[in-house]
Amino acid sequence: MRIFLCLIATTLSLFLKGEWPQFRGPSGNGHANGTGLPLKWDEDTNIKWKTAIHGKGWSSPVIWGKQIWLTTATVDGKKLSVLCLDRDTGRVLLDKKLFEVAEPQ
């Protein structure tokens, strides 16, 4: 799941111009206006960059300007963090723990 989120965010950021502010895209309907989208990708094909993240992906990526924002959580759900990645390079710009709970619900 960790690499998957980064791969999806990377693939989207390569071909989409503009922002991706919410789950399922700009209009919330799963449609994107990009052109030349790849029909195939894997670990090495049509991937611009990869960035390992800690925990597991906990949200849809948000793409805004030159940044990709996402949240991660530990497997036990006790810690939630927010990450900001550089859209062009995948470099981590911010990695901040948002909160920690003793007993997740």
Model-predicted regions and their roles:
Residues 8-17:
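Hydrophobic h-region of N-terminal signal peptides that target proteins for export
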Residues 1-8:
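Sec-dependent signal peptide recognition
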Residues 16-105:
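Noncatalytic, solvent-exposed loop/strand surfaces
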